[in-house]
Each structure stands twice: as C-alpha cells, then as structure tokens.
Amino acid sequence: MKIIRARTAGFCMGVSLALRKLDREVTENNAPIATLGPIIHNPQVMAHYEERGVRCLRDTAQVVPGQRVVIRAHGIPVAEETALKATGASVVDATCPKVKRAQLGIAEERGRGGTLLLFGEADHPEVRGLLSYAGEGAMVFGSLDELKGLPLRDDVAYFLAAQTTQDRAGFEDVVSWLRQRLGHDIPVLQTICDATRKRQQEAVDIARRVQAMVVVGGFDSGNTRRLADVARAQGVFTVHVETVDQLPVDELRKKSVIGLTAGASTPKSLIDAVQRFLESL
C-alpha cells in the first residue's frame, strides 16, 4: 500500500507557540498551572498535560489563588479575559497571533462604525472571542446559505471577517455574493490563516490522486473537520479519526493508494502511528 502524507500535516505555528508557552510554565514554575478551556482541540494532548498536573478550567469561577492561568490558543471573549484578570491569577496569553490580529482588526472596524458579518462556527471558542470585539449587531453564519437567510439591511455599514481556520473558497463565494446583494464592496478583513489555506489546498491536491483519505485530529477541531470536508468534496472516500484504533480497517484494506493529512492541533506522534498502521495493511 502506498501512503501519500501531506507535508503540512500537524502543528501550525499558533499551536506550537501555545504549547511552548504551556511547557515553559510547567517546567519553570512551582505554582499550580491551568488553562482556561482546552489550550488546543486535541484530547490526547490535553490528557498529556493533565498527567503533568495541568488543570483545564471551564470558567473563571474555578480559578484558585496563586494559580497561573494560560489563555487557550483560540483566544477568549473580552469579558472573560477581564474576569480572569480580576481573580488575581497570573495570566499567560497563549492566543494564536493570527487570532489576536483578527480580534484587533474587528475592534478597529467596529471603532469606525462598522457592523460585523462573521463567517464561522457560532459555537466555536474562537468565534465567541471574535464576536466579543464586534459590539452590537454582529452576525455569524456558517455557510453561504445561512448568510442568505440573515436579515441584512441596506442602511448598515457592514464589514466581513472569518474564523481563522475557515474554508478559503467558501469565503470567496461569500465575498462575491455580498457584493451582488449589497450592490457595493464592503471592507473585508483577510483573517483566514495562510497556513489553513495551504493545508486545505494540499489536502485537495492529494485527494485527487488517491483512493481514500485519512484525516487525523480532534473531533472538536474545526480546522480538522474542514480538511475532511474539502477532501470529501473531491469525491474520494474520506475518514476523520482521532487515533489509529478508529480506522475502518476493512474498507481501507481495499485501497492501494491512501492520502494522509492532519489538523493543526494533531501531534506528530499520532500521525506517525496512523501512517505505520496503514503501511502494515
């Protein structure tokens, strides 16, 4: 069996940076360490840090005196960050720089009187954080069809942004439709991470050359789910797994060429394990 592994598979810059900050806290501090929410969307990574004594807090009410709290890579809402600092905890901001740039860009456009239209998953922590910088009137949509159902007004000065891990092609479709619907251009913040674009494009390129695609990453990871979506859209059998034991072995044994990629929060060890198993079939 031939395996074509994506060169872009695995940790992105933002994830690597966040985990380096957390590793430094664990190594250099005697104080109790916690993250506010999962630092990244990968349960195996979270289990690794839990074994090292890192707590994952649901909210700021769980902060204890003397604790050092690391803000997740996805960022947090403004009100939550204010509440966290008010606890007196030592705060370490591990927000991805690309997410931070999106937050500040949205705040700047809001300051000019703009109303945000956000292309993203409404229940995703990054999106909740981005919306908190947008003020009243902001609307979020997960697809072009959802956007078409929103009550857009001709007398409102909209601007557009996207979750950093959103689908680039879908975003371009949104821009085109809004131009037609509103009859003019609106400010468009280029908030989709370039690493996301490259990862998705490589997944598409590989999917067109193989008989099956395996995508490795957390089921809660939006960028991993979208990798599976763009691969599946090429008409190839695609499976999204977190670990090697979830692979549909009987189905994959029928294939001679399999593509392998992984989300931005998937550790190399998990990708390697899946590749070794596939090569053994």
From Swiss-Prot:
InterPro entries: LytB/IspH. Dimethylallyl diphosphate binds at H41, H74, H124, S221, N223, S265. It is an enzyme of class 1 (oxidoreductase). Its EC number is 1.17.7.4. It catalyses: isopentenyl diphosphate + 2 oxidized [2Fe-2S]-[ferredoxin] + H2O = (2E)-4-hydroxy-3-methylbut-2-enyl diphosphate + 2 reduced [2Fe-2S]-[ferredoxin] + 2 H(+); dimethylallyl diphosphate + 2 oxidized [2Fe-2S]-[ferredoxin] + H2O = (2E)-4-hydroxy-3-methylbut-2-enyl diphosphate + 2 reduced [2Fe-2S]-[ferredoxin] + 2 H(+). The active site is at E126 (proton donor). Keywords: 4Fe-4S, Iron, Iron-sulfur, Isoprene biosynthesis, Metal-binding, Oxidoreductase. Its cofactor is [4Fe-4S] cluster. The keyword Translocase does not apply. Binds 1 [4Fe-4S] cluster per subunit. It holds the Pfam family LYTB. It comes from Nitratidesulfovibrio vulgaris (strain DSM 19637 / Miyazaki F) (Desulfovibrio vulgaris). Belongs to the IspH family. [4Fe-4S] cluster binds at C12, C96, C193. This is 4-hydroxy-3-methylbut-2-enyl diphosphate reductase. Pathway: Isoprenoid biosynthesis; dimethylallyl diphosphate biosynthesis; dimethylallyl diphosphate from (2E)-4-hydroxy-3-methylbutenyl diphosphate: step 1/1; Isoprenoid biosynthesis; isopentenyl diphosphate biosynthesis via DXP pathway; isopentenyl diphosphate from 1-deoxy-D-xylulose 5-phosphate: step 6/6. One of its GO terms (molecular function) is metal ion binding. Catalyzes the conversion of 1-hydroxy-2-methyl-2-(E)-butenyl 4-diphosphate (HMBPP) into a mixture of isopentenyl diphosphate (IPP) and dimethylallyl diphosphate (DMAPP). Acts in the terminal step of the DOXP/MEP pathway for isoprenoid precursor biosynthesis.
